[in-house]
């Protein structure tokens, strides 16, 4: 029997079954394919550079304090503890930074342009698998609401309602296809 050639793309990782916590995920209904942003225009980079200048209080600088990034997140309703903030930076690809006190413009661009990768997909799916022990790809509306209202960064009732709108649950049996939800969420995040 011939060995299969290794798959070099991320796109089929979850359709073949990924892993959460070192344990394989068996195939569930729906597949996940990463969505990639379109090429970044000069105007987009200019807008991000302006945002970076605002965070640096108008100074032309090569880095900004992480506390400014954390304050920005808090100003838009993302109130994170220091530990949670550092975890967000790690998940969004900033874990390899040597300077954890400042964010360079290059790292700022990476953060703003970050795409959802397999690690993030595994973490999202892992959260749903807590409720989906049978690995059907579905959770109830109650489980979905509980996950976002009580887990990790607790969502407000309004935010949960918005997430439910994105989830488009099946009205007949009150189930939510979390693979479809994750795909839609990824699409929205990657094309913001």
Curated annotation (Swiss-Prot):
Tell me which Gene3D superfamilies the record gives.
EF-hand
Coiled-coil features, chain-numbered ranges: none
Source species, domain of life: Eukaryota
Q: What is this protein called?
A: EF-hand protein 5
Extract the GO molecular function terms from the UniProt entry: calcium ion binding
Q: Which organism is it from?
A: Trypanosoma brucei brucei
Write out the GO cellular component annotations. myosin II complex
Where is Ca(2+) 1 bound in this sequence?
100, 102, 107
According to the UniProt record, where is the region Disordered?
1-36
Tell me the residue numbers annotated for binding Ca(2+) 2: 132, 136
Q: Which InterPro entries match?
A: CALM/Myosin/TropC-like (IPR050230), EF-hand-dom_pair (IPR011992), EF_hand_dom (IPR002048)
Its signal peptide is none
Query: Taking every annotated instance into account, which residue ranges of this chain make up the domain EF-hand?
Result: 46-80, 81-118, 119-154, 155-190
User: Any idea which UniProt keywords this protein has?
Assistant: Calcium, Metal-binding, Repeat
What's noted about domains in the record? This protein has four EF-hand domains, two of which may be functional calcium-binding sites.
């Amino acid at each position: 029997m011939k060995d299969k050639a290794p798959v070099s793309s991320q796109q089929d990782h979850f359709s073949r079954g990924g892993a959460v916590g070192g344990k394989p995920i068996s195939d569930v209904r729906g597949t996940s394919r990463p969505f990639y942003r379109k090429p970044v225009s000069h105007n987009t980079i200019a807008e991000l550079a302006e945002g970076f200048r605002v965070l640096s209080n108008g100074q032309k600088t090569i880095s900004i304090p992480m506390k400014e990034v954390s304050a920005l997140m808090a100003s838009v309703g993302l109130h994170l503890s220091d530990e949670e903030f550092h975890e967000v930076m790690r998940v969004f690809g900033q874990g390899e930074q040597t300077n954890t006190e400042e964010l360079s413009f290059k790292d700022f661009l990476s953060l703003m342009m970050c795409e959802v990768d397999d690690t993030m997909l595994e973490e999202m799916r892992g959260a749903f698998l807590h409720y989906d022990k049978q690995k059907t790809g579905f959770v109830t509306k109650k489980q979905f609401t509980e996950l976002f209202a009580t887990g990790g960064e607790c969502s407000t009732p309004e935010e949960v309602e918005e997430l439910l709108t994105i989830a488009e649950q099946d009205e007949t049996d009150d189930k939510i296809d979390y693979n479809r939800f994750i795909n839609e969420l990824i699409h929205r995040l990657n094309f913001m």
